[in-house]
Amino acid sequence: MTDKRKYKKTVSFTRCTAIIFLTTKEVSKQKEEIRREIAREFDLPERKSKIATILKQEDQAYCICRSSDCSRFMIGCDGCEEWYHGDCIGITEKEAKHIKQYYCRRCKKENPELQTIFRLVATERAAASNAASTSLNAPGVGPSGAAPAAAPVASATTSQQAPPPTTAAAKRKNSSAREPKMGKRCGTCEGCRRPNCNQCDACRVRVGHKPRCIFRTCVVQAATVLKESQATQAGPSRKREKAAPKSRNVQVGPRAASPEIFLNPELQGIRQCYGPNCCSHARPQSKYCSDKCGFNLATKRIFQVLPQRLQEWNLTPSRAAEETRKHLDNIRHKQSLVRFALAELEKRSEELNMVVERAKRSSIDTLGSQDTADMEDEQSMYCITCGHEIHSRTAIKHMEKCFNKYESQASFGSIFKTRMEGNNMFCDFYNPASKTYCKRLRVLCPEHSKDPKVNDTDVCGSPLVNNVFNPTGEFCRAPKKNCFKHYAWEKIRRAEIDLERVRQWLKMDDLMEQERVMRQQLTSRANLLGLMLHSTYNHEVMDELVRKQQEHLVEFEKQRRRLAHQQQIQTQQKQYQEKQKLMLQQQQQQQQQQQQQQQQQQQQQLQQPQQQQQQQQQQQQEQQQLQLKPHHLQQLQLQLLQQQQKKAQIPQKTQIIYLQKKT
């Protein structure tokens, strides 16, 4: 009876812890006591994990990374009171000591007038307090810093030797006098809003304290400091200047809010710009006349140094690259094993579907179910979840329902919905109250899934085995409603397959991340910065490289000469061929002309006898006519005929002479 009462108490306590959010210290102590009692009575890993999930309190998320890690350095926003990690927003713990008021980016976007305010360093405060005390103790020096012309010298000496006031009113006067000396940052000008450049000497100096960036000087503050310095220079008289060296205590002037600019003595004076092909003067405290010249020189150096570094990298094999490639091969082999395991799980799920379909088509075996019911003994046991005494026949059904009841008290959610190829294994039920998606397995989710309704004619269908592991090939044909031995066997089998799938997908995700890291290491190992900044000069390799380069140059020169000689020979051959072509063309033209002349001669030879016959006939006719005409007419006609004959004979002679010259 006492044990049962203890079990009832523990059950009531666990239900209360699952429903109520416990925040006080007393309730937390009660939770610890309850957890210890349950762990003592039920020392099981399933019970421990379930209690841990129920009693676990959600951690508060901070910073832009939305993590609950509070072990690192954090800084709070004075506007929205949100805490941020220093490494997430780029502020170190040393820098945070100099910040008086910090505002995050979200507050600055909502109200652009809000700006981060920095406090003065201890050295600056001491210098400012000394300057303020001396200015107050000086004769006739008001808050503006100007001294009257009629002030006596004796009063000045006595006032300098007087001790500084120690009362609260004097301290207030000192603080009020110190404020106009130092001046306040306006918070609205460009210098106040601009962040640190991280490039100037003020940003790089880390000795003693961090001075302010030269680009973050306040315009209003600089103007007030300039006015005060001009007033202090014009105010004191010559007598005061003579009396000043007699005082032993050296007075320190007020330090400006912005740090002093460090001047490099090597960069003083007029210097020529270091840029390539640039004859201009360099800027003050710089080596270049403009940023463009600096970029040009940097690119030129890169083009000069980088090719040699690439040759060095390609000559010597990298041991780290070989090891990363081996790791990559190993990771890919593991990925192939995971894919094979996922394919096997798909086959198992298909086989399970086939077994369920076969059970649906089969009929109930009433005789076998009665025999198994008679064989059950009447033993009792205790539930591992709630602790109640239950019958061994209904133990599996009771434990399943009890587990679902306690499982529904805890929530497992995420703000992102699962995106998977194929069948989704998770529940992904959206809870509008918590704005999360349920991340339980869909088969085992007790809140958002219900078991299908079982009819009287449904068969159990659970595969039967011998000695737990040896399947017989048969299945249970008892009614599904009355079969307590194989209660929810299909649900458990599907949950096992889905759980193994989740495990394999997580393993695949881990392997993909490892592959990404290895690939990034391979690509970043021979990048521009790595090759330019780090190099190992191997003399043996470089000597061999120089020798190879010289041999390559000699071979290249020989090849160039060979090509030039071949080109010269080719041009000569082309010229000779062109000359031969011209000669052949001329010979062909001469032959054509000779053939034409021969043809003309043959034609002329053929035409000459015909012409002679015609002439003879004409002469005979003319003679006949002359015989008929008078004698003087005959003489004239004879003369004309002779002239015509002479004209006809002249072109024949010229043609013959021309042909003789040609031949």
Curated annotation (Swiss-Prot):
Q: GO terms for CC?
A: Set1C/COMPASS complex
What functional role does this protein have? Component of the SET1 complex that specifically di- and trimethylates 'Lys-4' of histone H3. Essential for Set1 association with chromatin and trimethylation of histone H3 at 'Lys-4' at transcription puffs. Additionally, is critical for general chromosomal association of Set1.
**Which UniProt keywords are listed?**
DNA-binding, Metal-binding, Nucleus, Phosphoprotein, Transcription, Transcription regulation, Zinc, Zinc-finger
What is annotated about its quaternary structure and interactions? Component of the SET1 complex, composed at least of the catalytic subunit Set1, wds/WDR5, Wdr82, Rbbp5, ash2, Cfp1/CXXC1, hcf and Dpy-30L1.
ZnF (PHD-type) spans are 60-110
Which Gene3D superfamilies has this protein been placed in? Zinc/RING finger domain, C3HC4 (zinc finger) (3.30.40.10)
Pfam families, sorted? CpG_bind_C, PHD
Q: Which residues lie within the region annotated Disordered? A: 134-183, 230-254
State where Zn(2+) 2 binds.
Answer: C197, C200, C203, C213
Q: Which residues bind Zn(2+) 1?
A: C186, C189, C192, C218
Residues carrying Phosphoserine: S258
Zinc finger boundaries on the chain: CXXC-type: 175-219
Q: Which PROSITE patterns match?
A: ZF_CXXC (PS51058), ZF_PHD_1 (PS01359), ZF_PHD_2 (PS50016)
Gene that produces this protein: Cfp1
Q: Please verify whether the record's keywords include Phosphoprotein.
A: yes
Composition-biased stretches, type Low complexity, lie in 134-161
MF terms in GO = DNA binding; methylated histone binding; zinc ion binding
Locations listed in the record: Nucleus
- Report the CDD domains cross-referenced here: PHD_Cfp1
Q: What is this protein's record name?
A: CXXC-type zinc finger protein 1
